[in-house]
Amino acid sequence: MIMPQTRLVVADNTGAKEIMCFRILGKKKVAQVGDIIVASVKEAVPRSNIKKGDVVYAVVIRTKRTIKRKDGSCVRFDDNAAVIIDKEGNPRGTRVFGPVARELRDKNFMKIISLATEVI
């Protein structure tokens, strides 16, 4: 459950380390895995393309909140993480760190799925 003011770890190599959500796209109060958010960069690597204070679009790939699946299984991650995307929905980075949830496949984020090392 990602709400406005929630800080997320950035799980790609764009140069941002941490972002803060301030808007959830669509008529939703909270964002789950696979939802697109608008966020502000709070911490970034020096000399990177993305600077502190930039407004970016991101897709949530991991949440601490338990994800209940149709088959009865539950999945929970250690952190809240997102991948920065452009307006078309393509990831801006070329690598995705850590596992991603399988729910991204249902939302048609195939490029992120292909870059991920592990899909759970």
Curated annotation (Swiss-Prot):
CDD domains: Ribosomal_uL14 (cd00337). The keyword Transport does not apply. Gene3D superfamilies: Ribosomal protein L14. One of its GO terms (molecular function) is structural constituent of ribosome. PROSITE patterns: RIBOSOMAL_L14. InterPro entries: Ribosomal_uL14, Ribosomal_uL14_bac-type, Ribosomal_uL14_CS, Ribosomal_uL14_sf. Transmembrane segments: none annotated. GO terms for cellular component: cytosolic large ribosomal subunit. Pfam families: Ribosomal_L14. One of its GO terms (biological process) is translation. Keywords: Ribonucleoprotein, Ribosomal protein, RNA-binding, rRNA-binding. Part of the 50S ribosomal subunit. Forms a cluster with proteins L3 and L19. In the 70S ribosome, L14 and L19 interact and together make contacts with the 16S rRNA in bridges B5 and B8. PANTHER family: 50S/60S RIBOSOMAL PROTEIN L14/L23, LARGE RIBOSOMAL SUBUNIT PROTEIN UL14M. Belongs to the universal ribosomal protein uL14 family. Binds to 23S rRNA. Forms part of two intersubunit bridges in the 70S ribosome. This is Large ribosomal subunit protein uL14. It comes from Dictyoglomus turgidum (strain DSM 6724 / Z-1310). The gene is rplN.
